[in-house]
A protein has these predicted regions:
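Asp-based, Mg2+/Mn2+-dependent phosphohydrolase catalytic module
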Residues: 1-37, 132, 146, 150-324
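N-terminal helical cap/lid subdomain that shapes the substrate entry/recognition surface
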Residues: 2-3, 7-42, 47-125, 136, ...
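Conserved G/P- and acidic residue-centered "switch" motifs that form tight phosphate/ATP-binding loops
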Residues: 47, 142, 257
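Short, surface-exposed alpha-helical recognition segments that flank or form part
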Residues: 54, 118-122, 140, 225-233
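Short, flexible active-site loop motifs that bind/organize anionic cofactors or intermediates
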Residues: 68, 98, 117, 139, ...
Length: 324
């Protein structure tokens, strides 16, 4: 006689979920199917807090002030120039570098963000609870600098809701020999100063590309100068962020308030959520008035957490000793 052990499947087995009992096939699928997403990638400004806070408007004004006070740009041109640079380069900072201005990045960020009305932001416990309940990797992806990102998240009470922050310094690691893809190093790569201070932040007029005059022509000839800055909505910036964080674009959900950033994300394979309007646009898989509408708009995001809520009822399969 020889004895052996095996797991018997002849005993009755049933489990229940939120909606009731699951049959055997549903039980198998429940434990074998992967969630649709591995990671939720969030923009910061005007996405995790509303546009009505006034920070975006203040940021634009601060950029104009910096251009006039520190770069000696004619106040009569600063407003138009700010608009054209943002439209054509993704950020005003990237545009200023493209057309020939030299300045210290840390100084500009400190000037522009240091004067923002952070007092308009308040802790958001509702958003915090929602984010903490989502069973995925969660990352911030912003064009802003690390100081602003940290301060904003801290005020909102969300500083520990995210695994890491991909920011200006992450995407523009000047003076680094390589970009780390270590997940533990996602937060704030490339913290070294990205340009050396110059004796003057202004530049001679002969060195500056006149983008206003160029675009005012009926048929502008040539192409605009390229910027050394990597930022959204560049597809290269999004692909770099995905590489740094080791993300599969087809298993990542991207949250943004910018239509052009949403469309760029869609082009690289991301599923996308436009925040700030309920009107869907080309490139947006979902459109929400507020990030707070997420549970109602995409309830499936919480289904990935179903396994932790499974309740077993009845008799389970048990190890049985048999004689053969």
């Amino acid at each position: 006689m020889q004895t052996s052990s095996f797991i018997s499947s002849s005993m009755p087995l049933s489990i229940t979920n939120r909606s009731g009992s699951l049959n055997e096939m549903e039980f198998v699928n429940l434990f074998t199917q992967k969630p649709k997403y591995d990671c939720l990638l969030f923009d910061l400004d005007d996405t995790l807090y509303p546009l009505s806070s006034g920070l975006a408007e203040a940021c634009r004004q601060n950029f104009k002030d910096y251009m006039e006070e520190m770069l000696c740009i004619d106040p009569r041109k600063s407003d138009n120039l700010c608009t054209l640079l943002y439209k054509n380069y993704g950020t005003t900072l990237a545009g200023l570098k493209a057309i020939g201005y030299d300045f210290d990045y840390d100084e500009l960020h400190s000037f522009v963000h240091g004067r923002l009305p952070y007092v308009n932001l308040k802790p958001d416990p509702v958003l915090r609870k929602m984010l903490m309940s989502l069973p995925y990797r969660k990352l911030i992806f912003t064009n802003a600098d690390k100081v602003h990102a940290l301060k904003t998240l801290n005020i909102l009470g969300l500083e520990d809701c995210f695994e890491g922050i991909i920011c200006f310094e992450t995407l523009n690691p000047i003076h680094r020999s390589s970009v780390s893809v270590d997940e533990d190093d996602i937060e704030f790569l490339g913290l070294t100063r990205t340009t050396k201070p110059t004796s003057s932040n202004s530049a001679s007029s002969s060195q500056i590309f006149d983008i206003i005059d160029h675009l005012a022509q009926t048929n502008p000839s040539g192409i605009l100068p390229k910027s050394p800055i990597v930022c959204k909505p560049s597809e290269n910036a999004i692909q770099l962020a995905l590489k740094i964080a080791n993300l599969d674009p087809h298993r990542t959900l991207f949250f943004e308030d910018s239509v052009r950033n949403i469309q760029a994300g869609k082009r690289v394979g991301l599923d996308t959520v436009l925040i700030g309007t309920s009107q869907k646009v080309q490139g947006a898989d979902y459109a929400l008035e507020s990030i707070h509408n997420l549970p109602e708009a995409i309830p499936d995001l919480w289904e990935a957490d179903l396994k932790s809520e499974v309740v077993y009822t009845g008799k389970l399969a048990v190890e049985t000793t048999v004689t053969a």
